[in-house]
Amino acid sequence: MGADATGDTAARGDRAAHGDTASGGATGGTAGNIATVDLHPSLLPLAFLVGTWRGEGVGGYEGMESFHYGQEITFAADGRPALGYVSHTWWADEPRDGREPGSPMATETGFWRVQPPATEPGPDGKVNGSPVVEVMLAHPFGIAEIYVGTVTGTRIDLDSNVLIRTATAREVTRSVRLYGLIEGGDLAYAIDMEAGGKPLQSHLSARLHRSPS
């Protein structure tokens, strides 16, 4: 949904991200070398995200020709208990369907929050001791999403909890996201989507480099 609008998301983190997100933690940078002067204490598990990331990814879906896109994501801290989030994507493929390289594609805006780890057992009977992540996103094509998941080291697993759409928006019924740091300190992600009556499947994945401050 992030490029123009995941199945096992983790298995596809290396498809277009060109690397593997680590299980539980990731190789590369850590929060220790990120300036966190404006970071609310509750957001320390997400400190590794703070800053601007830029790179390229690949997208596709059943019935859709695959495509490449460029992306810039900014996670901003201002002292409050939520990271501000803005993502912009643009066409990075050959001209097609009226799109030229650099043509704007999609925008996501929202906030990321962290809650204490769950204390009650989940469906598997186990207590997940990882901090809970809540993500709220809005899209200009008529959809708003709330994701709930966990952060373990520098890996974040998210599943859509609420999807709201306008009467004219396309039908999206579920979205699953995986974010994580990979080798070299890059940020990789993969997004699976269930939409239009089609099963949950790979939609987007990318590898982003941290932009200089």
Curated annotation (Swiss-Prot):
Heme b binds at residue 203. Residues 1-26 are annotated as: Disordered. GO terms for molecular function: heme binding; metal ion binding; peroxynitrite isomerase activity. It catalyses: peroxynitrite = nitrate. Keywords: Heme, Iron, Isomerase, Metal-binding. Binds 1 heme b group per subunit, that coordinates a highly solvent-exposed Fe(III) atom. Residues 1-10 have a biased composition (Low complexity). Pathway: Nitrogen metabolism. A motif (GXWXGXG) lies at residues 51-57. Its EC number is 5.99.-.-. CDD domains: lipocalin_heme-bd-THAP4-like. It comes from the Bacteria. Transmembrane segments: none annotated. Pfam families: THAP4_heme-bd (PF08768). Its cofactor is heme b. Forms a 10-stranded antiparallel beta-barrel structure able to accommodate a hydrophobic ligand in its interior. In fact, this fold hosts the heme group, which is located in a wide surface cleft. Homodimer. Heme-binding protein able to scavenge peroxynitrite and to protect free L-tyrosine against peroxynitrite-mediated nitration, by acting as a peroxynitrite isomerase that converts peroxynitrite to nitrate. Therefore, this protein likely plays a role in peroxynitrite sensing and in the detoxification of reactive nitrogen and oxygen species (RNS and ROS, respectively). Is able to bind nitric oxide (NO) in vitro, but may act as a sensor of peroxynitrite levels in vivo. This is Peroxynitrite isomerase. It comes from Parafrankia sp. (strain EAN1pec).
